Amino acid sequence: MKNTGLCLNSAYFGFYAHAGFVHGLVRGGFEPSIVTGCSSGAMIGALYCAGIDMEEVVRLIQKIRKNDFWEGNALTQAAKIFARGVSRYSGLLTGRKIRALLEPYLGGLKFSDLKIPLGVAVSNVTTGRRELCTEGSVLDSVMCSMAFPFLMEIQKMKGNDYIDGGVVDHEPTKEMILDPSVRTIVVHMIETERETPPRSPIVRAFHASLSIIDHETRDLKDRLALARKTKIVRAMTRTPHLGPDRTHYGETALHAGQKSAATILRSLKIPRSRANGRGLA
């Protein structure tokens, strides 16, 4: 759809709901001119922009289980800390199995190869800056954007260290707001329902910090969008709490994403149209 951007936000194990949401949009005839994504949103956004049929993406996501991305066990993880030392340890997973899972779809692709312009939000630990990747390796950028602190090791790209873009930017819309060719931005947000709050004070403080950053930056971007007369439409999908040992709730999350897409399509009255945007600056 001309002049319309799509943003897939950062969400822990949010690839189920994001896949369902994009699948639902595609079935409804919606095609954005630009896509941005962060963390799990970057993964689904990249697969979609690469031209992978969303039916195939849904099948891929439905099959994901812990063994597809988890590395080792408690003993090998402890040995890893001992071998590297605390000062050089940055996460449980190297990300190699996730990269292998995505390699058949994104391996070797540059951003310039994509069917739809894509921006991937990442956090540059080396420079202390948030970045939106629009050039270079798509897979490298997605891996950096998905490197959730302490779960996945810090990722290397072009000589710099990177972690999950969602640490500082849950919904990367700034560049689209500043792009005069984009008049409407559809943002897919995911909210997970935790059965009980985290008991650890450190974990609670970490999650609270992310939430505060998210709310503050969202408010600023909403003000920027208002000033530039860019319409932001948010679709909220609520899912069960997901994680490495809770992938069995993935199907529920996927269907919830599809329902959110149907709601957005009805509210926006999206016509069947092909994109014709300029890309991200």
Region roles according to the model:
Residues 1-38, 46-281:
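Patatin-like phospholipase
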